[in-house]
């Protein structure tokens, strides 16, 4: 038993000290990834070596992309004319944007894969994919001429205007 223990360590031989360190965070980390910083942990007992500091990461959700392992998922709206007739669509990526070809008769919920446009694998085994899911949007307001043209289209289609609902009811 110490007769006069130190005021800083109370006789334990160690005292608490706050410090900042810089860690290199590799590409591909996800929530729960644990990084180790050697000898930046608690001081060793009786002059022994310092312990290691472990930092558990929490990755903030992205405003555009959802993540499933190394793959990214992105939902993009398209107009119903592009869905029906096909066309080109510019989509966001981690590094900018890319164009995808939308085939005619594309349905809402269809997913297009852009290989290698996801997140780098933490162990260095390639890169995930970017999966773009399209949501077909119908105009909220139509003028008289647009309504007339759509009605004309519906009349031309007859019973085939909604083929999926037909198979659903059978």
Predicted segments, located by residue:
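Non-catalytic interaction modules of co-chaperones and other macromolecular assembly/maintenance factors
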Residues: 1-170
